[in-house]
Amino acid sequence: MSNRKIFVQDVTLRDGMHAVRHRISPTDVKRIVTALDAAGVDAIEVAHGDGLAGGSLNYGPGSNTDWEWIEAAAEVLEHARLTTLLLPGVGTISELKHAYDLGVRSVRVATHCTEADVSAQHIETAREIGMDVSGFLMMSHMAPAEELAKQAKLMESYGAHCVYVTDSGGRLVMNDVADRVRAYRDILDEGTEIGIHAHENLSLSVANSVVAVQNGVTRVDASLAGHGAGAGNCPLEAFIAVANIEEWEHGCDLFALQDAADDIVRPLQDRPVRVDRETLTLGYAGVYSSFLRHAEAASERYGIDVRTLLLEAGRRRLVGGQEDMIVDIALTLAAQATKEAV
């Protein structure tokens, strides 16, 4: 398994925004970017957790604008590629171009796993202005491997250099990942890269990322201390340790990543990013990982167990963008409980 070249994409400052409710100072952004850059990651993604223009009452407002965070990152970045995320319908072409003007040179255009067609304009525009572009098929567990691969092919046809298996709910197990990566490889052009974005909800993020690489993935998402939505993303320092054991090629300094994770990122967390009864339920139910904080808030307000809310969200097959439905579920379940008590 040696001589595999891995492109390490850090998501601490994008997916990790969910873990701190999109609240981080530009000063801390600079500290994290400086540490990641020195540690040798290939790319650093910066944006609100729900991508450019994601700050809203539905998704959660940010402590700062995307532009303030991106400017802070660009100011100290020396080596890594500055990346951002955009969800069509949330972020616009205008915002994509403004991000480019601020120094962003790579974008991941994200859609639900069966809605790749809405990414066409954004992928095409990103290519036109000279950006590296990846397609990001979220909630990849909700589509069979063959259907997901067809969606990946659409993104490739629009101009994506890479398409991701994006396990937003942390629901995929190793065989699921292998099946999806192989299906991508069977249908995509040889020159199109494949990426993996894993979550830790079932404690499988490193294992899933390793299996993905073994089956042909070259771009791997990870974050310091696993800092991300739900139980977090693939912990960067743990993945790099495995990559070293497997003798895969990458430019990362393991000890520097460990130091950044423990000394900079963990102290910022107001809720531990870990597998616990709530985050495990996210993966078990196949629920979008960013629903965690919304479900916890609704649980506290309406007195319904977080796990009950998440199981119902999974039963309803809710997807990213439907965070407001958590309150609807809580109200419905609270009314049922009151009726049963009478």
Curated annotation (Swiss-Prot):
Site entry: Transition state stabilizer: 14
Binding residue positions for substrate: 14-15, 168, 197, 288
Catalysis performed (reactions): (S)-4-hydroxy-2-oxopentanoate = acetaldehyde + pyruvate
Highest taxon of source: Bacteria
EC top class, as a word: lyase
Domain Pyruvate carboxyltransferase: 6-258
Alphabetized GO MF terms: 2-isopropylmalate synthase activity; 4-hydroxy-2-oxovalerate aldolase activity; manganese ion binding
Catalytic residue positions: 18 (proton acceptor)
PROSITE patterns: PYR_CT (PS50991)
Keyword Iron: no
One Pfam family linked to the record: HMGL-like
Keywords: Aromatic hydrocarbons catabolism, Lyase, Manganese, Metal-binding
Entry keyword Ribosomal protein: no
Biological process terms in GO annotation: catabolic process; L-leucine biosynthetic process
Alphabetical list of InterPro entries matching this protein: 2-IPM_HCS-like, 4OH_2_O-val_aldolase, Aldolase_TIM, DmpG_comm, DRE_TIM_HOA, PYR_CT
EC number: 4.1.3.39
Chain residues that bind Mn(2+): 15, 197, 199
UniProt xrefs under PANTHER family: 2-ISOPROPYLMALATE SYNTHASE 1, CHLOROPLASTIC-RELATED, HOMOCITRATE SYNTHASE-RELATED
Family affiliation: Belongs to the 4-hydroxy-2-oxovalerate aldolase family.
NCBIfam families on file: 4OH_2_O_val_ald, PRK08195.1
Name used for this protein in its record: 4-hydroxy-2-oxovalerate aldolase 2
Organism: Rhodococcus erythropolis (strain PR4 / NBRC 100887)
Lineage start: Bacteria, Bacillati, Actinomycetota, Actinomycetes, Mycobacteriales
